[in-house]
Amino acid sequence: MSHRKYEAPRHGHLGFLPRKRAASVRGRVKSFPKDDKSKPVALTSFLGYKAGMTTIVRDLDRPGSKFHKREIVEAVTVVDTPPVVVVGVVGYVETPRGLRSLTTVWAEHLSDEVKRRFYKNWYKSKKKAFTKYSAKYAQNGAEIERELARIKKYATVVRVLVHTQVRKTPLVQKKAHLAEIQLNGGSISEKVDWAREHFEKTVSVDSVFEQNEMIDAIAVTKGHGFEGVTHRWGTKKLPRKTHRGLRKVACIGAWHPAHVMWSVARAGQRGYHHRTSINHKIYRIGKGDDEGNAATNFDRTKKTINPMGGFVHYGMVNNDFVMVKGSIPGCKKRVVTLRKSLYTNTSRKAVEEVTLKWIDTASKFGKGRFQTPAEKHAFMGTLKKDL
C-alpha cells in the first residue's frame, strides 16, 4: 500500500550511471587477470551464447553448514561455446598514459563470417576487405614477419583477435562476433609464437577454463525500454489521492540550484546495460560430440544437455558448452564474454569440489515430466502423431 514517510534513504544506486543503452551488444573486457610468466600461454577469456537455464541436484560438501552432505537443488545457466577462431594478434606498449597499440597482424585467410563484421550491407558491397592485406603473404611474408618481430621487441602486452563461429549455433545471425583476448603466461616471444601458430585455427573452451573454476560473465542485460521512475529506481508510490498520478517523484529538487540534480530519480531507459557478474562457479564443461554429456555417476541415462524440445527461444546446443551456477546477464541468444577471475578466490564456496547427481532435461515449455523421448514413449506408448 502506498504511504508517506517523513524520511527515507535514497532509492537506487548511483554507481552505475548513466543508465543508458549499451554502445555494443558484446560484453567488453576492460580488465584482464594479472599475467604470470611461469605458467603456459593461454587465453584469459572466451565468447559464448546464452542458451538458457536448467536445474541440477548435488550433494553439498561444506563442513559446518546445516546442509552438509545433503542434497540441494540449484539453478544453472548453459552457455553455448563453439570453438573460436584466432585471426590476428595485437601488441601493446606501456606509456605514461596507459597502454597504446603498437601494431596489428592479421591472418592470411579470413572467413566471410568475420568479414561481414566490417560491412554495413554485405550483399551490396564488393567484398574486398583484406584483399590487399592478404597479398602481403604472397610476397614471401617478409612484412608480416617484420611486424611480428616488432611486437616481440617492444610490446609488453599481447592480445589475440578471435571470432565466434556463429554458423554452428541455432542463431539466424551470419555475422561473427570479433573480440580481443589477452594472452597470459610465458614470455612475450612465446606469446607471439603461440598466436602465429594458431592463426586460422580453433581454440576450444576446455583449453581456457576447467571445472570448479570461478569465472566472470560480462554481457549486456535484457532490455526493457523506457520505464517509469517507480519501476526504474524503486521509489515509493505516492498516497492514493495524489493529484496527477501516484508513480512519480513528488519533489525533484529545490528552487535553487535552478536545475534538476543528476542524482534525482527520473524515468528513462531500463535494461540493455553493460554489466559484469563475478564469481560464477563452473559446474560442467561438456563436449558437443558426447551423446551423454548430461549423464552423471548417479544418473546413467544417456542424454544430452538439451531439454525436451530444446532450450526455449534458443534451440539445440550441439557444441561444447559451459554450465555455470546461477543466472548471468543477458537474454537468450545474446553473446556472453566469459573471463577468468581477476583474483584468487579462497572462500569455501570457491574451493569446494562439485559433483553433480542429476541434471534436469525436461521440457522448459510448460510442466515437463519426461527427461528423454524414450522415457516419454515408454509411458505414453505410440501416439497418434507418430503413426
UniProtKB/Swiss-Prot annotation:
One of its GO terms (biological process) is translation. Keywords: Cytoplasm, Ribonucleoprotein, Ribosomal protein. The keyword Disulfide bond does not apply. One of its GO terms (cellular component) is cytosolic large ribosomal subunit. PANTHER family: 60S RIBOSOMAL PROTEIN L3-RELATED (PTHR11363), LARGE RIBOSOMAL SUBUNIT PROTEIN UL3 (PTHR11363:SF5). It comes from Candida glabrata (strain ATCC 2001 / BCRC 20586 / JCM 3761 / NBRC 0622 / NRRL Y-65 / CBS 138) (Yeast). Belongs to the universal ribosomal protein uL3 family. It is found in: Cytoplasm. PROSITE patterns: RIBOSOMAL_L3 (PS00474). The gene is RPL3. Gene3D superfamilies: 3.30.1430.10, Ribosomal protein L3, domain 3, Translation factors. This is Large ribosomal subunit protein uL3. The keyword Ribosomal protein applies. GO terms for molecular function: RNA binding; structural constituent of ribosome. InterPro entries: L3_arc_euk (IPR045077), Ribosomal_L3_dom_3_arc_sf (IPR044892), Ribosomal_uL3 (IPR000597), Ribosomal_uL3_CS (IPR019926), Transl_B-barrel_sf (IPR009000).
